[in-house]
């Protein structure tokens, strides 16, 4: 089998895995294209709303924040003996390359659920406060906003979180969450508790469950703490997290005809992603750090 045929077969395998993969990150994060080495998000929280125009326009002065996401490089690559590929005709390596395609599509899940969420209690948001904190300043209004709790997941703590999100304000003191598309983000260990809270139509005694379907359950295996839980409002253009993409090369090959192949008789295949993930609007996320 010639090199071009092998490459086409592996490319097909890659996109079979990529297209079939299901992701969770896009439920809670906004994908933003990047055109430079880094992108500035100092405008978060200060997007002006429409007002009645009485004479001249009145440009809103935005709060000055410093929040920048620098792009990083990520890759996944394999080394294959050229002779093995020709003998195998991609049968053995097809599943491996499909797995790389799956990994390429789902990698932002690891960034969002494996890093941003659990570290939100110690990582800073655009306002210089911890992303999950008890005293986020609301612009220059003099008031503060808390999106952090410490109570275990139950009906009471869930409703504290839900009310907090619905009452969240932007820098101008106006509601951020004018609608609610709530997602309860949990580790696998809290699945039974979450299902009892949100998916049981009736309580154990037979009374109606007032929290029935008040939020969708999102279970992430990347969350390793067994007690912490999160409530996200996924409504709106700007979500609590940002996935920034500068460049994506789905499938690259270094094979027959290259100097590396001439010396070692080995082919190299891989995928490349340049980007990053960071924090968006903390007003749309609530985190419970349970002792």
Where are the language model's segments positioned?
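Long, hydrophobic/aromatic-enriched structural stretches that serve as scaffold segments
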Residues: 51-103
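Residue-level signal for secondary-structure boundary elements
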Residues: 19-26, 33-36, 105, 112, ...
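N-terminal catalytic cores of peptidoglycan-degrading enzymes
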Residues: 1-38, 244-250, 254-257
């Amino acid at each position: 089998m010639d090199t071009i045929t092998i490459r086409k077969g592996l490319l097909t395998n890659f996109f079979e895995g990529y297209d079939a993969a299901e992701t969770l990150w896009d439920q809670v994060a906004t994908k933003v294209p990047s055109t430079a080495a880094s992108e500035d998000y100092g405008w978060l929280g200060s997007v002006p709303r429409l007002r009645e125009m009485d004479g001249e326009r009145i440009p809103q002065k935005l709060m000055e924040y410093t929040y920048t996401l620098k792009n990083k490089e990520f890759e996944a690559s394999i080394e294959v003996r050229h002779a093995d590929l020709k003998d195998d005709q991609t049968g053995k390596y097809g599943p491996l390359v499909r797995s790389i395609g799956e990994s390429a599509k789902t990698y932002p899940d690891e960034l969002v659920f494996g890093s941003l969420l659990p570290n939100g209690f110690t990582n800073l948001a655009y306002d210089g406060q911890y992303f999950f904190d008890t005293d986020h300043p609301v612009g220059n209004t003099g008031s503060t906003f808390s999106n952090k709790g410490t109570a275990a997941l139950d009906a009471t703590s869930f409703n504290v979180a839900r009310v907090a999100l619905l009452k969240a304000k932007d820098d101008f003191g106006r509601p951020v969450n004018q609608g609610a598309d709530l997602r309860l983000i949990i580790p696998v260990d809290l699945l039974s508790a979450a299902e009892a809270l949100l998916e049981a139509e009736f309580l154990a005694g037979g009374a109606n469950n007032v929290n029935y379907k008040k939020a969708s359950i999102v279970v992430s295996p990347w969350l390793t703490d067994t007690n912490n839980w999160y409530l996200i409002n996924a409504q709106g253009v700007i979500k609590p997290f940002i996935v920034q993409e500068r460049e994506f090369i789905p499938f690259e090959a270094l094979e027959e005809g290259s100097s590396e192949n001439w010396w070692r008789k080995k082919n190299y295949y891989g995928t490349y992603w340049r980007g990053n993930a960071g924090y968006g609007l903390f007003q749309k996320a609530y985190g419970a750090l349970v002792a």
